[in-house]
């Protein structure tokens, strides 16, 4: 991706080196929403807690490589701001830009405390995306999804959850919690995640029109989408898959919805909720 020398976002909060507090306790209040909207990408939602410890300032000096990733995700966030402001404007709506919070080890959010192993996530309580930049290496090494555009896909996917929050989609799914069987509820969660993949594809569609993509970028995004499919993660972790427990979609589904958004570049074709399981 052509990103160096381009505008970065002013909506980045750097909390690297700050203590996020102890991990423990239970989730309550708005923290429950995070089960619906945050993206595991290999993480564990039970790590999120309802604790509200004080965050302490520490002097933090990252490596040159880490700072380059920080600069990169800031440019990606700026691109999402340009794209979604334009898309929302086309539909007669105003886009409220989210904040990207960079952290190390653990972080306090309005949805509770999260550790790095949670993976990148979006918290609707403060309309913020949270990313530990060590995930860039994890994406490459653990998930075998290298490349800067793989990380760009992750950021764009989390922004996709913010779009869902603004459009009210995530709340509609949240309201079903406890009202339907768990297996059925998982199907709604899966559609929420696949729609976020679609929105990430919409962003990539516009970025291509801006002539910021390089050869191989889309392949990197598709590889990342495939790497975080429920079937692939479960197979690697336990040697078998349990389809009724899927909450993010299979590798093929995640690839398909990202690419569908990339080709369409609009909101209309991203309604995952009107389709049957076989149509996903």
Where do the protein language model's features map onto the residues?
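Long amphipathic alpha-helical segments used for membrane anchoring, targeting, substrate engagement
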Residues: 1-62
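Acidic helix-start/capping segments at beta-turn-to-alpha-helix junctions
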Residues: 61-69, 73-82, 89-113, 179-180, ...
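Short helix/loop segments within enzyme catalytic domains
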Residues: 74-95, 187, 191-234
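Catalytic zinc-binding patch centered on the HExxH motif and its immediate surroundings
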Residues: 106-132
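Short pre-active-site segment immediately N-terminal to the catalytic Zn-binding motif
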Residues: 135-153, 184-188
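Catalytic Zn2+-binding segment of zinc metalloproteases
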Residues: 159-174, 208
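Pan-zinc metallopeptidase signature
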Residues: 228-280
């Amino acid at each position: 991706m052509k990103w160096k020398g381009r505008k970065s976002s002013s909506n980045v909060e750097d909390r690297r080196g700050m203590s996020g507090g102890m991990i423990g306790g239970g989730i309550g209040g708005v923290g429950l929403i995070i089960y619906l909207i945050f993206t595991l990408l290999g993480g564990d939602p039970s790590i999120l807690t309802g604790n509200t410890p004080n965050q302490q300032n520490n002097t933090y000096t990252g490596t040159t490589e880490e700072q380059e990733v920080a600069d990169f995700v800031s440019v990606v966030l700026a691109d999402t701001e340009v794209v979604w402001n334009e898309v929302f404007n086309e539909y007669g709506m105003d886009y409220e830009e989210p904040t990207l919070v960079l952290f190390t080890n653990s972080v306090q959010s309005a949805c509770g405390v999260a550790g790095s192993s949670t993976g990148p996530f979006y918290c609707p309580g403060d309309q913020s995306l949270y990313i530990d930049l060590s995930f860039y290496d994890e994406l490459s090494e653990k998930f075998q999804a290298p490349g800067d555009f793989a990380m760009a896909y992750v950021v764009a996917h989390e922004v996709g959850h913010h779009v869902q929050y603004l459009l009210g989609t995530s709340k509609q799914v949240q309201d079903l919690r406890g009202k339907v069987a768990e297996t059925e509820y998982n199907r709604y969660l899966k559609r929420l995640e696949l729609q976020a993949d679609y929105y990430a594809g919409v962003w990539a569609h516009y970025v291509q029109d801006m002539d910021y993509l390089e050869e191989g970028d889309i392949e990197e995004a598709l590889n990342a989408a495939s790497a975080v499919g429920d079937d692939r993660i479960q197979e690697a972790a336990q040697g078998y898959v349990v389809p009724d427990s899927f909450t993010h979609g299979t590798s093929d589904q995640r690839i398909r919805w990202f690419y569908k958004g990339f080709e369409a570049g609009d909101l209309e074709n991203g309604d995952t909720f009107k389709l049957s399981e076989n149509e996903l």
